Amino acid sequence: MRRQPAKVAALLLGLLLECTEAKKHCWYFEGLYPTYYICRSYEDCCGSRCCVRALSIQRLWYFWFLLMMGVLFCCGAGFFIRRRMYPPPLIEEPAFNVSYTRQPPNPGPGAQQPGPPYYTDPGGPGMNPVGNSMAMAFQVPPNSPQGSVACPPPPAYCNTPPPPYEQVVKAK
């Protein structure tokens, strides 16, 4: 008596497993009569037999995702290590010598400095850059090729402040 409930339980468990597992029911004609067969969930019906798809690994999207992430990580790490171990050579640039002449100290407020006047300060024409730090930054040394070229002075309106807004509006 005890064996019978165990057999019934095993039979029910087997039926439950068979029903829950997704299977494909296939059939084909042999002569005039159909012949039935069952394939597993990952198999397809192929004529008179079951066959496995060659590209069934495409269903494993997480496998391909992890594989591509691993390849990208390895390539990035290899590139980083290669750049650290073998840094690119520095480009050799030609030597660029910068030389400048120091201006003599300012002798006094009324004394004129020797050399051409500089027109960088809007305070007025003929102002020397000794007291003007902005003009000193853009000063051309006298022995450079640009210093020997004679340039005409800028127009007079460059050294005057702009007219007031009201005057410009009334003129139009």
Curated annotation (Swiss-Prot):
Transmembrane residue ranges: 61-81
Protein name according to UniProt: WW domain binding protein VOPP1
Residue spans, topological domain Extracellular: 23-60
Its job: Increases the transcriptional activity of NFKB1 by facilitating its nuclear translocation, DNA-binding and associated apoptotic response, when overexpressed. May sequester WWOX in lysosomal vesicles and thereby regulate WWOX role as tumor suppressor.
Organism the protein comes from: Homo sapiens (Human)
Similarity field: Belongs to the VOPP1/ECOP family.
Residues in the Cytoplasmic compartment per record: 82-172
Keyword line: Cytoplasmic vesicle, Endosome, Lysosome, Membrane, Signal, Transcription, Transcription regulation, Transmembrane, Transmembrane helix
Gene Ontology CC terms: cytoplasmic vesicle membrane; endosome; late endosome; late endosome membrane; lysosomal membrane; lysosome; organelle membrane
Organism superkingdom: Eukaryota
Self-association and partners: Interacts with WWOX (via WW domain).
Effect upon mutating residue 157 to A: Does not affect binding to WWOX
Gene encoding the protein: VOPP1
Membrane topology per record: Single-pass type I membrane protein; Single-pass membrane protein
Keyword DNA damage applies: no
